[in-house]
């Protein structure tokens, strides 16, 4: 059975990484069960294994942490729900691509509870929403904003790190980076989309939809 852990106060990033790694190691050894940890961080940027230095536009704005998860630069901060997912893929299937797709499907299903249509895009990991009310890009491409980021790491086929969904963060904090290395498109949140969703509301949706996507 998956243990659900929720932290009410913002968790410092180094502490979260240490806790995740310890839990993942314990799962791999058969000494602990799987877990999903719901939390928020103080304002910070993280750099994944594919991060480009040029995508860090304002290195002095918030602390920057190098991390060994997949992906590029992302922002974490208050008003953003982070879900660290520590699952044993030895029993759930040793397929990294399928695992990431299930994380995306989980986010999309949770957003659907609030009548938000999330979508994935080829070559752009994460979940996006159409913004037809915004002017298209100069080449005519319709505007889309990112509402959720995904970046995971596996050790002995146990996952850690996970995903983040924007509920009501300060979206200007994303200006210090090129989020996930993708130029042109922006970021949004549930509240930015005009929905009075709370963190507790999202947590209920995440828990319900997790079992639909991943099972027990």
Curated annotation (Swiss-Prot):
Its EC number is 2.3.1.181. InterPro entries: aa-tRNA-synth_II/BPL/LPL, BPL_LPL_catalytic, Octanoyltransferase, Octanoyltransferase_CS. GO terms for molecular function: lipoyl(octanoyl) transferase activity. It catalyses: octanoyl-[ACP] + L-lysyl-[protein] = N(6)-octanoyl-L-lysyl-[protein] + holo-[ACP] + H(+). It is an enzyme of class 2 (transferase). Keywords: Acyltransferase, Cytoplasm, Transferase. SUPFAM superfamilies: Class II aaRS and biotin synthetases. GO terms for cellular component: cytoplasm. The active site is at 180 (acyl-thioester intermediate). It comes from the Bacteria. HAMAP family: LipB. This is Octanoyltransferase. It comes from Jannaschia sp. (strain CCS1). The lineage of its organism: Bacteria, Pseudomonadati, Pseudomonadota, Alphaproteobacteria, Rhodobacterales.
């Amino acid at each position: 059975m998956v243990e659900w852990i929720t932290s009410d106060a913002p968790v410092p990033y180094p502490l979260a990484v240490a806790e995740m790694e310890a839990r993942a190691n314990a799962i791999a050894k058969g000494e602990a069960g799987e877990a999903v940890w719901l939390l928020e961080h103080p304002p910070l940027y993280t750099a994944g294994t594919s991060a480009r230095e040029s995508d860090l536009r304002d290195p002095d704005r918030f602390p920057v942490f190098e991390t060994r998860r997949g992906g590029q630069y992302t922002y974490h901060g208050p008003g953003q729900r982070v879900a660290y997912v520590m699952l044993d893929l030895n029993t759930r299937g040793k397929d990294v691509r399928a695992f990431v797709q299930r994380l995306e499907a989980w986010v999309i299903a949770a957003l659907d509870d609030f009548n938000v249509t999330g979508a994935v895009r080829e070559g752009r990991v994460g979940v996006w929403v159409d913004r037809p009310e915004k002017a298209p890009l100069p080449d005519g491409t319709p505007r889309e904003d990112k509402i959720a980021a995904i970046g995971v790491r596996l050790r002995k086929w146990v996952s850690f790190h996970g995903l983040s969904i924007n509920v009501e963060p300060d979206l200007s904090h994303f200006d210090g980076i090129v989020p996930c290395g993708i130029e042109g498109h922006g970021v949004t949140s549930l509240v930015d989309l005009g929905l009075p969703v709370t963190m507790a509301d999202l947590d209920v949706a995440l828990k319900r939809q997790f079992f639909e996507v991943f099972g027990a």
